[in-house]
Amino acid sequence: MLDLKKILNNPDYYRNILLNKKANISLFDELVKIGKKRGELMQKSQSLKAKINELSKSFIKLKTNEEKNELKAKISKIKKEQEQKEKKSELIDDRVFFLLANLPNIILDDVPFGEDENSNIVIEKKENLGNGLIVHDFSHYDIAEKFGLVDFKRASKLSGPRFVIFKNQGAKLARALMDFMLDTNIQKGYKEILPPFIVKGHNLFGTGQLPKFEEDLFKLENGMYLIPTAEVPVTNYYNDEIINLDKPKMFVSFTECFRSEAGSGGKDNRGLIRSHQFKKVEIVKITNEQDGIKEFEKTIEDASHLLELLEIPYQKVLLCSGDTSFSSMKTIDLELWLPSEKRFRETSSISYFGDFQGRRAKIRYKQNDKTYFAHTINGSALAIDRVFAALIELNYDSKNELIKIPEKLVPYFGSSQIARK
């Protein structure tokens, strides 16, 4: 959530950025208008309170009942006016909160303006890892089904389209990737959390999925939701708390993730790229303002390191304003190479949120006797299903009907290859 005081101090700056973030600008204009009105009412209310206090102090100096009654009437009249101003201000507060809740975050100065993904900027490529940018026509879902690693048909029978069953060596490979990613991140100082996969709605508000993106979520009864990402329960671990942030809080978490994929239409109907339920290892940091950008850069390095260890060619992409998510100030996507599609596909979005989520989730810290909202960072490290797909395609030996396992993953998987049976 944005800071109303900062908006009112510089409305033109915020308006321009939010236009480029594809915000509903009519909400912003209304916010500025009623925000100013709210400020005037609050200022007038405080002024009247001060006047009441001043008059009350003079009460003991009065000698006659007539003077006292006259002052009482005057104070009563002012108090009534003050209460009216305060009540009007409180009524405006509800609307201000609604408007702030539905406006996206601003962006950092180095984020380029742009409408959509076509304006994103590739800032680095690592093309020579493993077998490099090979191309072929063997899709991961065909290879995986041929080797008996997955079962899409029976998953559909159980749960409908966009679900998968990992089985045999496929289940083992998914588990190996999970353990490898968790262990590697833990070695870098992240603390592991295994949270609930069901959360209360206010937690989704805290991280910015609600109220704007409810259609993308799986809603249960009693205001409960399946998590779309570990970002939600892990960031909200400190919801409505004041914590010590002399050092960043660093967490890593494996979870199943659940998304309705509303609006995805016919995109990626087959395979592991876009599912209703998928596996992901997430890294989350909660920091003070001074450490925010530095820790964001470290988080990008940590997620990238996993792709390098797995020998997967990838590129780093700086998202433009129009493609940056609702809550994010800056996002770097890590995109891995898929030979059958002859293109890069996202496997991680590492985002810096400033105090946007901290303000919504009321996560605070003290510094020099003042209280501030925490800054947050998160990103996948990594999306297991998409890494699974890339590993199969990149390491498939069609001549010998083998899938080779990257060297760093062998201790977790227990073998250097998967043979077709």
From Swiss-Prot:
Its main location: cytoplasm. The keyword Cytoplasm applies. ATP binds at R259, S260, E261, E346, T347, S348, S349. It catalyses: tRNA(Ser) + L-serine + ATP = L-seryl-tRNA(Ser) + AMP + diphosphate + H(+); tRNA(Sec) + L-serine + ATP = L-seryl-tRNA(Sec) + AMP + diphosphate + H(+). L-serine binds at T229, A230, E231, E282, S380. The keyword Ligase applies. Its EC number is 6.1.1.11. One of its GO terms (cellular component) is cytoplasm. InterPro entries: aa-tRNA-synt_IIb, aa-tRNA-synth_II, aa-tRNA-synth_II/BPL/LPL, Ser-tRNA-ligase_type_1, Ser-tRNA-synth_1_N, SerRS_1_N_sf, tRNA-bd_arm. Homodimer. The tRNA molecule binds across the dimer. This is Serine--tRNA ligase. It comes from Mycoplasmopsis pulmonis (strain UAB CTIP) (Mycoplasma pulmonis).
